[in-house]
Amino acid sequence: LIKDYNTAGGGKYAEYYTPHAIATIMARLLVGDNADLHSMECYDPSAGTGTLLMALSHQIGEERCTIFSQDISQRSNKMLKLNLLLNGLVSSLDNAIQGDTLVSPYHKSDDGQQLRQFDFVVSNPPFKMDFSDTREKIAAMPARFWAGVPNVPAKKKESMAIYTCFIQHVINSLKKTGKGAIVIPTGFITAKSGIENKILHKIVDDKV
């Protein structure tokens, strides 16, 4: 049901559906066979219907983790909540939020001043999409988007590399001992300049 929704009814977000095999590989890389994990907090800032989070919770153990999510699509968020119900994660239902993560992140620290940080963060964000209507709001938060915010292409607004903002958000949302995994386009790794290169330098220099 979830897969059919993503491939047939997900609208403009459908292309970002994560295949189950990829989600499983990411979860195994993050968690391994560690049986000593308890009270883990897992987060996806572009959760869609929750494929990555479900794989992660299965790898950790549903009874040993709490799920947190946010997604801009109301329809996807409703399907994610169904996914939580079907996978025995009822206690996490209130943590599944519909909204714009980049402009208005919901999950914050207790004092509301900082982003909440998690043990595990996973994401398969939109690689390129028209975010021109919120670009200036995002750019007005340099502390969060320290590597910069991509410009809106003059001719093809939908080719804005918005995924670079999600990478920065993922890094900001990790505990010092946390682990993250994010699906990115292959060109990111070989970037020699721009926002992508700044992010790569931070990952290496700060040993993220």
Locate predicted features.
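Conserved Class I SAM-dependent methyltransferase catalytic core
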Residues: V152-V208
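Long recognition/docking surfaces used for binding and targeting
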Residues: L1-G10
